[in-house]
Amino acid sequence: MYKVGDNLFHSFMSVEAAITTRISRRFAELRARGEMGIIPYITAGDPSLDASLEFVMALAEAGADVIELGVPFSDPLADGPTIQRASERALKSGTTLAGVLELVRRIRKLDSVAAEIAIVLFSYYNPILQMGLEKFADAASEAGADGVLATDLTAEESEEYRTILHAHNLDTIFLGAPTSTDDRLRQIANVSSGFLYLISRTGVTGAKDSLPDDLPSLLRRARGVTQLPIAVGFGISQPGHVSVLGGLADAAAIGSSLVAEIETATVRGHSLAVIDRVSEALAARIRSLKQAGREGLSKREVAP
């Protein structure tokens, strides 16, 4: 176990600074243009990997900046019921980590703006360990992934993971929480690259009606300990949420509300016509959220 200030954490700052991925390039572009990023999440393989490919194309073409591909897992403790059900459907359709990596390869071969979209693999640590760290990092990098967020891996336990992923030019993204002290936020930021992901509230994922009152304070505290771009997720679902975040964060991550839209539309089947309709609905949602982010930037109270 390591404490804040140990040489381990300082040594990795230079490694992370050297990493250049589509993620860091995209955030640099957003900063230069004065735009807020939108990061949609979908569970890969829900309802099928072919459908996920169509959804990624629609999200990217609508203006998404980074896409999180969820790797389905049988025991998703950090997720609320919506994403838990999505994982169950994806596993039932036969989706594996290897299949998700193949999906990334297919995305990179598209004749679409999606071919250059920044992709984060959003996974529990167990599937990565089952594949083997070195094999996973090599396969993820070769497929065209840009970063990995292992939801249940702590900063203290991540040294080997970070070493191997950084060697394959993969960003390592970690979660900061409202309960994190300033020292803890600094520790998490120091082992992160690409961006720092702040969860807006404690508990599991899921769409909420309003943002927590203490969220601005959390953003200010995080700004005080890192120069990394900051994305906020968990409970973000409405344009109004994104508009508020436009004055505080560099990006908003939206997951459960999109996954719920996929679930509702495909519960009785997922024909090509259904997938097309879902793709159009997801694209419309992203365009609306991007516009809300632009409106929110006019209220920015903390410089990025």
Where are these regions (language model features)?
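Glycine-rich phosphate-binding active-site loops on the catalytic face of alpha/beta enzymes
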Residues: 67-74, 147-149, 154, 198-206, ...
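Catalytic cores of alpha/beta
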Residues: 50-58, 181-189, 236-252
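Active-site-adjacent beta->alpha loops and helix N-cap segments on the catalytic face
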Residues: 19-24, 75-81, 95-102, 129-133, ...
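Active-site/ligand-binding-proximal alpha/beta "capping" segment
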Residues: 195-251
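Alpha/beta catalytic cores of nucleotide-metabolism and tRNA/nucleoside-modifying enzymes
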Residues: 15-18, 220-226, 237-304
